[in-house]
UniProtKB/Swiss-Prot annotation:
Note: Part of an operon that comprises bigR, blh, XF_0764 and XF_0765.
Lineage: Bacteria, Pseudomonadati, Pseudomonadota, Gammaproteobacteria, Lysobacterales
Annotated TM spans: 4-24, 45-65, 71-91, 114-134
Protein name: Probable transporter XF_0766
Predominant location: membrane
Length: 135
């Protein structure tokens, strides 16, 4: 399989899982909302399988395709922790995360999600440019 098919297959599976979660459970596939409900003692019977699938999905992929991408993170642990906290803060401020707004929200033609996703993308490009990623 060509390396270009992996992102296409991933997008198809993301879309399929989003539609299935909405149709079968009436829930939006926003990871921050799902994890938030779990941490607040929500209904684990509906949310745990989705989170487990997020963790096991890449492992199943690596077994099936005999490929597991190597990831190198050059940042220090304090930087990673601060970045994670900032992402969490931004998620709360925007009433959702990239998966909730970018995948489920745009698919539902939500104006709030379209604006939020545009801001996510612009902020990401600005940050990458500021950090010198494009040099």
């Amino acid at each position: 399989m060509s390396e270009y098919w992996y992102p296409i297959l991933g997008g198809i599976l993301l879309g399929l899982s989003t539609v299935m979660l909405l149709l079968l459970n009436g829930r939006i596939a926003g990871i921050s909302g799902i994890v938030g409900r779990l941490l607040q003692g929500g209904n684990p019977a509906q949310d745990i399988p989705f989170v487990v699938g997020l963790v096991l999905g890449p492992l199943v992929f690596s077994v099936i395709f005999d490929r597991f991408p190597s990831v190198t993170v050059a940042a220090t642990w304090p930087t990673i922790i601060v970045a994670g906290l900032l992402v969490g803060l931004g998620t709360r401020m925007s009433a959702g995360c990239t998966s909730g707004h970018g995948i489920a929200g745009i698919a539902r033609h939500s104006p709030r999600s379209i604006v939020a996703t545009a801001i996510f993308l612009i902020s990401g490009m600005a940050t990458a440019t500021f950090m010198g990623v494009y040099q």
